Amino acid sequence: MSKALIKFIRLSPTKARLIAREVQGMNAELAMASLKFMPNKGAKYIANAISSAVANGGFEANEVVVKSCRVDAAAVLKRFRPRARGSASRIRKPTSHILVEVAKAEVKAEEKKTVAKKAPAAKKTTTTKAPAKKTTSTKKATAKKES
């Protein structure tokens, strides 16, 4: 397993995490190919981190899998924009750290799948309701109580 860490990228971590979730568990070669056609700014940085992690381990891109791709928040650059009446509003420019781990792909032997049999359907039984108690109307009940 090899790692690559790119620090202080001028990119919002929430936007980069959307792309990082897409490539987790993918083959590294396939992940880099799919990131190449994504229009997002973070796709370029994540593809760079994946290729760096593959090179750090001395692997070929087609024989490794992206085990994890994590995007953490880094320091936030704070800038000010002048506003009306001498005030100013704060502008936040977030940065992020990208950590990519790649590992050798495990080749799984084809195992014979056993299909679980369905349980037999339950027999339908008809239930009869107990007869409801007869209720007397309220006018009749109050008339009987008074007399």
Curated annotation (Swiss-Prot):
Keywords noted in UniProt: Ribonucleoprotein, Ribosomal protein, RNA-binding, rRNA-binding
Record Pfam families: Ribosomal_L22
Disordered: region residues: 110-147
Single Gene Ontology MF annotation: rRNA binding
Bias kind Low complexity: ranges: 117-140
Disulfide bonds: none
InterPro entries: Ribosomal_uL22 (IPR001063), Ribosomal_uL22_bac/chlpt-type (IPR005727), Ribosomal_uL22_bac/org-type (IPR047867), Ribosomal_uL22_CS (IPR018260), Ribosomal_uL22_sf (IPR036394)
A biological process from GO: translation
GO CC entries: cytosolic large ribosomal subunit
Primary role: This protein binds specifically to 23S rRNA; its binding is stimulated by other ribosomal proteins, e.g. L4, L17, and L20. It is important during the early stages of 50S assembly. It makes multiple contacts with different domains of the 23S rRNA in the assembled 50S subunit and ribosome. The globular domain of the protein is located near the polypeptide exit tunnel on the outside of the subunit, while an extended beta-hairpin is found that lines the wall of the exit tunnel in the center of the 70S ribosome.
Subunit structure and binding partners: Part of the 50S ribosomal subunit.
Similarity comment: family membership: Belongs to the universal ribosomal protein uL22 family.
Name the UniProt record assigns to this protein: Large ribosomal subunit protein uL22
Organism: Campylobacter jejuni subsp. jejuni serotype O:23/36 (strain 81-176)
